[in-house]
Amino acid sequence: SGELERRLESDQKDELLAKVRRISHMANIHFVWQTELNGLGDAVSHGRTFVGSDPFALLLGDTILRQTDSSKPVLQQMTEVHEEKKASVVALEEVDREKVSRYGIAGGTQIQHDILALDQLVEKPLPEEAPSNLAIAARYIFQPEIFEHLSRTPRGKNHEIQLTDAMAAMLSDHEMYGFRFSGRRYD
């Protein structure tokens, strides 16, 4: 971001500044700041004018995913699923059943070794109400239709607009897939 570059420049951290600038030319990265904390769904909705009618990747910056059984990064593998299925894709990780109430949880049918056709998404369910122990893992590739669903999503848990609720609504008229990655999540 421009803010980071200005800070590095003023601190005379030229080598780090050069790396940041090189990275910024590799992809079209856009940061959106919420004026009020109204949930992840609200934050994503602020990106609508930037995204337009294109599919887009959403990476939550407070989480790192490290793939252990492939030389390909998680997002690259998700992109391959998206290109094949022409549908939204979300990263999934197995969590202990007693921890499902901390995450958005997905349910669906396994169609390949690491791919599920999703039919259920629930934000922070009680363990006995969870459709599985597959947690949404901070990486998404969305079709632009998510924005219509976000605009109609009422406030949910903690009186916030929950991305998981909009995704669940999207399942009624769009396919969505889960990519089950093998590795570690650092949150």
Model-identified regions with their sequence ranges:
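Terminal amphipathic alpha-helical/low-complexity segments used for targeting or macromolecular assembly
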Residues: 3-10, 28, 52, 83-85, ...
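Structural beta-sheet core signal
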Residues: 58, 90-91, 178
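A short acidic, often aromatic-flanked loop/helix-cap motif at beta-alpha or helix-coil junctions
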Residues: 36-40, 97-98, 127-129, 185-187
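Short, conserved catalytic or adaptor-binding loops enriched in Gly and charged residues
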Residues: 17-27, 81, 109-115, 169-171
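Conserved N-terminal catalytic core of the sugar/cofactor nucleotidyltransferase
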Residues: 1-60, 65-66
